[in-house]
């Protein structure tokens, strides 16, 4: 399993708008994409304008196919006005499920 983590700082006070975008656009349009196992939105308890999205994928190939897709590019472009310039995306391989 592979994980894509996107971290970012939003414009001050933009969290509610971002959360609405995430639930109405990201979660809805990516549901059923090949290889996507789960998706989560996390909000910092220390900074209300900081968040992380975590998506879990069956394979690195599935993750990369999504990341390079037109859909992913469109969603990123639609959300970019909510960020204040601090943003990164990283990929990880799950080495231990802890189960």
Locations of regions flagged by a protein language model:
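Short S/T/G/P-rich N-terminal loop/turn motif that feeds into the first structured element of a domain
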Residues: 1-51, 56-70, 83-99
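A common structural junction motif
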Residues: 73-74
């Amino acid at each position: 399993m592979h994980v894509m983590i996107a971290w970012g700082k939003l414009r001050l006070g933009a969290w509610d708008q971002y959360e609405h975008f995430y639930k109405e656009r990201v979660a809805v349009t990516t549901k059923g994409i090949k290889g996507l196992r789960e998706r989560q939105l996390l909000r910092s308890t220390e900074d209300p304008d900081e968040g992380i999205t975590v998506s879990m994928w069956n394979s690195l190939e599935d993750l990369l196919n999504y990341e390079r897709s037109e859909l992913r590019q469109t969603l990123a472009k639609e959300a970019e006005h909510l960020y204040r310039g601090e943003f990164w995306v990283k990929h990880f391989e799950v080495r231990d499920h802890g189960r």
